[in-house]
């Protein structure tokens, strides 16, 4: 356990939010930055995960965001778009379970959302390779940015 955890988290949050413009200027720009903000904007436009994943545009931008974040380079190979889309849309009910568990979630009652996220992680199959840590965690962040 981290001593004074809440104080440490509050301090880190303050640093990040207070310096976000500087952080953004130093780190990623270009296509990855564009698609990251585009997917977050789209997620805000679609208040339910079911509506978000039913949108062809949202799935396409999600795919492009992952590609721009190097998910289809070096050893990482994403599935073809149709397989990617089918896996996401075939798991809408699992995404909706995360959404339901996250509603009203607090640190004290986090177990249901953690379990729902673990279930979703296990069900996602977005890569041609068996490696899925980065692709699945990025996808889950793009779809559930508040978690």
Stretches found by the model and what they are:
Residues 141-145:
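Hydrophobic/aromatic-lined pockets within catalytic cores
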Residues 1-129, 146-147:
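An N-terminal alpha-helical hairpin/helix-loop-helix interaction module that forms a charged
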């Amino acid at each position: 356990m981290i001593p004074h955890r809440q104080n440490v988290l509050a301090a880190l949050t303050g640093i990040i939010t207070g310096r976000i413009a500087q952080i953004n200027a130093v780190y990623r720009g270009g296509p990855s930055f564009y698609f990251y903000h585009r997917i977050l904007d789209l997620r805000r436009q679609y208040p339910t995960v079911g509506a978000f994943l039913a949108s062809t545009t949202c799935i396409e931008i999600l795919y492009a965001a992952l590609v721009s974040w190097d998910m289809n380079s070096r050893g990482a190979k994403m599935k073809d778009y149709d397989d990617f889309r089918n896996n996401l849309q075939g798991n809408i009910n699992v995404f909706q379970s995360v959404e339901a568990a996250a509603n009203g979630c607090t640190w004290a009652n986090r177990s249901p959302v953690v379990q729902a996220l673990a279930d979703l992680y296990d069900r996602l199959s977005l890569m041609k390779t068996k490696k899925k840590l980065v692709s699945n965690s990025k996808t889950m962040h793009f779809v559930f940015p508040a978690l």
